């Protein structure tokens, strides 16, 4: 491809609304173009990388015994009502009506459609197992699209669904997909982690996320350096600090003028934060909830949402707190009525806590769960963090940032039961099909590759997913010798099947080098009068600072050998 014919332009300035590195570099390199919030066009360079990622995915899916199909994006809302997932997805679903006033949605995922197909085409144990996948656009009305391709409203996704006759069959499908996903990321040249995850609105009994490690990732990965445990922070469990049990003391009200934050109250009363209780207020499907936790811990809203089994959970606004009769900054469950109280199990681990007196400017000393208040629900609703104790060994948690690029779920039978997707066994007994689902974000994978592979100058593409393998930088192309040499190398490489972007533009060396670094093509060949006078071509890998002069008569062989070694991942 000649750069002079390439559709798209690079830009020097960092777009003001681009927060993540990948968003900045995708826009600056001209690889994507925004149409509206969370909706992007893939320009030719990015689309070449997308196609390479899709091809790697297809190869690994096919190797794992999967069959590719295509399902409709347009779905009747009735199948979402039948599955019971219309409410959990909530406003994320794009709703529309056709000319006959029928309610439809744009598919955010395809569990409903594939289960409907399974109910029609799988009848016997002889029809099992089945593994079916597609690579297709999905639509989700994200409230805050951000991060370029990280969180968008239209995105490309590979979704695969497994159908098995037994839990052991599901385990086999699940493990096969786990290994296939790891192979995809390895072949794309990326470092990934597999971590425990929350199933969210998809549902199911178990799930794992695949994270591409990147400093600017939107997810927090909690892991133990001493053992193999790793989880998304929203799912992670940890060993909470044990407090000594004391003889219960009488409640005592004390004045705490102007002290509202836990740290301020603890300092004012000369106690440790772990000896206090804090209250956080939420609205769960429109109902006011007080969550109570030890002062040295924070609420994990995903755990709280799962415990409450609600579709919508958010922090209560000031007006809602006042309407509930709660005094923010001095609140506790002591003496409150007609309010749902949810407590973290840490409140049972300790005694004689400091908590709010439900009066502005006052707190209570010697508050004890069971004696002074009772929780309507009690469970682990605490957020794990760096420094938390590992529950599986004596290690201490560390943390990394990451970008989620894949999520796999053991769905079980809850969808097949709702759709009547049953099979008969060898004895003629009917059973619901056991399902799994496996998603992989293709556009996210592209963005995550950049988050993990870049420097201050631009993108550094791994060879397997680079839009082009070689960037030929021709300098002073008005010189006939330079032009002839550049054209000859370009033609020879293309004849060998090498993917080449030939910068044939009449621009300065500085502009060309800047664009080469920004676009991040893995291998750059610079052909100039000075290099040719020395009998060679400047050969430089994008990830290296050093370059070398390679003789003209061996440059093609050197390029082929380098591409092979860089692609064998």
Curated annotation (Swiss-Prot):
GO cellular component: cytosol
Keyword set, alphabetical order: Aminoacyl-tRNA synthetase, ATP-binding, Cytoplasm, Ligase, Nucleotide-binding, Protein biosynthesis
UniProt enzyme class: ligase
Gene3D superfamilies, A to Z: Anticodon-binding domain, Bira Bifunctional Protein, Domain 2
Compartments where found: Cytoplasm
Domain of life: Bacteria
A biological process term (GO) from this entry: prolyl-tRNA aminoacylation
GO molecular function, a single term: proline-tRNA ligase activity
Pfam assignment, any one: tRNA_edit
Described purpose of this protein according to its UniProt entry: Catalyzes the attachment of proline to tRNA(Pro) in a two-step reaction: proline is first activated by ATP to form Pro-AMP and then transferred to the acceptor end of tRNA(Pro). As ProRS can inadvertently accommodate and process non-cognate amino acids such as alanine and cysteine, to avoid such errors it has two additional distinct editing activities against alanine. One activity is designated as 'pretransfer' editing and involves the tRNA(Pro)-independent hydrolysis of activated Ala-AMP.
Family according to the record: Belongs to the class-II aminoacyl-tRNA synthetase family. ProS type 1 subfamily.
Domain notes: Consists of three domains: the N-terminal catalytic domain, the editing domain and the C-terminal anticodon-binding domain.
Subunit annotation: Homodimer.
Protein name, UniProt field: Proline--tRNA ligase
Source organism: Dehalococcoides mccartyi (strain CBDB1)
The gene coding this protein: proS
């Amino acid at each position: 491809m000649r750069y002079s014919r390439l559709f798209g332009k690079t830009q020097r300035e960092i777009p003001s609304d681009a927060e993540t590195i990948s968003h900045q570099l995708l826009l600056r390199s001209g690889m994507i173009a925004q149409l509206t919030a969370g909706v992007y066009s893939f320009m030719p360079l990015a689309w070449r990388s997308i196609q390479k990622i899709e091809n790697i995915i297809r190869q690994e899916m096919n190797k794992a015994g999967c069959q590719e199909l295509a399902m409709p994006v347009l779905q009747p809302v009735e199948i979402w009502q039948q599955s019971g997932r219309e409410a959990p997805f909530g406003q994320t679903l794009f709703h529309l009506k056709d000319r006959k006033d029928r309610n439809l949605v744009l598919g955010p995922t395809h569990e409903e459609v594939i289960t409907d197909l399974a109910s029609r085409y799988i009848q016997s144990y002889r029809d099992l197992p089945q593994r079916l996948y597609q690579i297709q656009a999905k639509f989700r009305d994200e409230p805050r699209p951000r991060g370029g391709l990280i969180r968008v409203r239209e995105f490309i996704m590979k979704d695969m669904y497994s159908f098995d006759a037994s839990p052991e069959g599901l385990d086999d499908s699940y493990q096969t997909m786990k290994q296939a996903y790891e192979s995809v990321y390895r072949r794309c040249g990326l470092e990934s982690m597999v971590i425990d995850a929350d199933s969210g609105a998809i549902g199911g009994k178990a799930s794992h996320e695949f994270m591409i490690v990147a400093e600017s990732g939107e997810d927090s990965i909690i892991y133990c350096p001493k053992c193999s445990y790793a989880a998304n922070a929203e799912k992670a469990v940890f060993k909470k600090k044990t407090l000594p049990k004391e003889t219960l003391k009488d409640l005592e009200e004390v004045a705490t003028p102007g002290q509202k934050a836990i740290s301020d109250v603890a300092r004012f009363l000369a106690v440790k934060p772990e000896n206090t209780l804090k209250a956080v207020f939420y609205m769960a499907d429109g109902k006011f909830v007080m969550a109570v936790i030890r002062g040295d811990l924070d609420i994990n809203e995903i755990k709280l949402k799962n415990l409450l089994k609600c579709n919508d959970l958010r922090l209560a606004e000031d007006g809602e707190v006042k309407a509930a009769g709660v005094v923010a900054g001095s609140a506790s469950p002591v003496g409150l009525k007609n309010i749902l109280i949810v407590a973290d199990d840490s409140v049972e681990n300790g005694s004689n806590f400091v908590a709010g007196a439900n009066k502005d400017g006052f707190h209570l000393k010697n508050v004890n769960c069971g004696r002074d208040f009772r929780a309507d629900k009690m469970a682990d609703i605490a957020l794990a963090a760096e420094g938390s104790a590992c529950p599986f060994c004596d290690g201490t948690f560390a943390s990394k940032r990451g970008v989620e690029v894949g999520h796999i779920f053991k769905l079980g039978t809850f969808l097949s039961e709702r759709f009547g997707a049953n099979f008969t066994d060898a004895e003629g007994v009917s059973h619901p099909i056991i399902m799994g689902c496996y998603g992989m974000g293709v556009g996210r994978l592209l963005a995550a590759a950049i988050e993990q592979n870049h420097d201050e100058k631009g993108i550094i593409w791994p060879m397997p997913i680079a839009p082009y393998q070689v960037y030929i930088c021709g300098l002073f192309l008005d010189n006939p010798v330079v032009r002839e040499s550049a054209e000859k190398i370009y033609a020879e490489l293309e004849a060998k099947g090498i993917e080449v972007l030939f910068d044939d533009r009449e621009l300065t060396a500085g502009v060309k080098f800047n664009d080469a670094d920004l676009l991040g093509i893995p291998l750059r060949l610079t052909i100039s009068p000075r290099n040719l006078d020395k009998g060679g071509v400047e050969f430089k890998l994008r990830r290296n600072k050093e370059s070398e002069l390679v003789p003209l008569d061996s440059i093609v062989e050197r390029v082929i050998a380098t591409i092979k070694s860089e692609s064998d991942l």
